C-alpha cells in the first residue's frame, strides 16, 4: 500500500483539494496510507498557496528539507500542487529539479497519470492548464469520516481585485452543475454528515446549470440544499460583498439550517483604498448589507478579512478601517499586512509606507478585533449552545471539541461516541478564541 504525506497551505479550498488528491490516489492504488512524517512516505505532496509571500517561500523551504529523502530514495515521488504550482509552473522544476510532478488546482484529477508518466519517462511532469469542470467529472465519490464536510460548488474568480492572484492561479469563475452538487451532498448525508460547508472562491457568484438548461443561482441552491434529508446545518465560504444580493440575505430569514455565521471580507474601511483594490463597493454599501442581515438575524456572527499597508494607505484611511471595525463589531476577523503578488496590478503601485508602520497598524487593528471577540465570548457564558462534536480537543487530548452554530470552538468532557453527533452544551468559561462547556443532561 502506497504511503502518502501531504502538507496543505492556505485556504479551505486547498483543504478540500488535498482530500481529493488522496481520493484519486486511493482509487488508483486500491487504497493508500496517509502518514504524518515525510520520511515515511512513498509520495510527498505540497498543496500550495500564493496569496501571501511568506506562504510561497515556505513551500520552497519545505522542498529543500525533503531533498535529502529523494537522494536516499530516488523512487520517492515529490509533487507540488495548488496556486504556487499554477503561478510558477516550470520554474519550480528549474529551482528544485528533484520535484517530479507540478500540477494546478484544476488538474489534480490527473495526478495518478502524471506519476505514471514520470516513472515511465524519467521526466518531471508539469500540467497547470485550466480544463475547468473536467476536474469534477473525474473525481471519485466523496468519502468522509466526520460529521461535517466541504462541498466545492464553484471555483475561480472573475473579480480581478488589484492585489489578488486567484484569477491567475485558479482561473475564471465556473460553477458545477446543480445535480452534481446535490448528488455529492446527498451521498455525504447518507454517510452520516450533518453539516455541509459550500465552498468556492466566491460562492455567491454560483450559476449552476440545471437539467432543463436553466441557471440556478446561489440563493436558490441554498434553498434546495436546505431540504436534503439528514443535513442539519449549512455554511458557506467565501463570499464577496459585490454579489451579496437581497435574495441571499432573505435566506437568513427563511432557512433555519443556515447557521448564524458569515465570513464576508471587506479588506478596508476606506473608500479610496477599496477603489484602488478594485473591490467594487463602498464602506457604506458593505454596512448596508450588514444592517439588513442583522435586522432579520440579530444573533449573526460576523467575520471578515482586512489588509493593512496597501500601497498609498494613509493614517487617516487606516483610522477609517478602525472605525468601521468598531461600528460593525465583528465577532472575529483576520488581518494581513499587504504583500505584493507578482503579476497583479497592485504590485506596480508605489509603496512608501515603512514596514514598521504596517506592523503597528496590524497590531492596532488586531487589538480592537480581539477585544470585541473576547467581549462577545463572555456574553455566551451561561447560555446553552447546540453543537456539532468534531473530535478530540486540540488543547487537551482528554477532552472533546465541538463547534457552535456561530462558529465558536467549545472544549468539554465527553465520551468518544459523541463524536460527529449534535449535542447541547452549556458554556461555562470564555477565552478569546475558544469556550469551555459542559453537557446539558436531558
Swiss-Prot record:
MF terms (GO), sorted A to Z: 4 iron, 4 sulfur cluster binding; metal ion binding; N6-isopentenyladenosine methylthiotransferase activity
Cofactor: [4Fe-4S] cluster
EC number: 2.8.4.3
Annotated localization: Cytoplasm
Residues where [4Fe-4S] cluster 2 binds: 157, 161, 164
Domain TRAM: 378-441
Domain MTTase N-terminal: 2-120
Entry binding sites for [4Fe-4S] cluster 1: 11, 49, 83
UniProt cross-references to CDD domains, sorted A to Z: Radical_SAM (cd01335)
Domain Radical SAM core: 143-375
SUPFAM superfamilies linked: Radical SAM enzymes
Family: Belongs to the methylthiotransferase family. MiaB subfamily.
Protein name: tRNA-2-methylthio-N(6)-dimethylallyladenosine synthase
Originating organism: Neisseria gonorrhoeae (strain ATCC 700825 / FA 1090)
Gene name in the database record: miaB
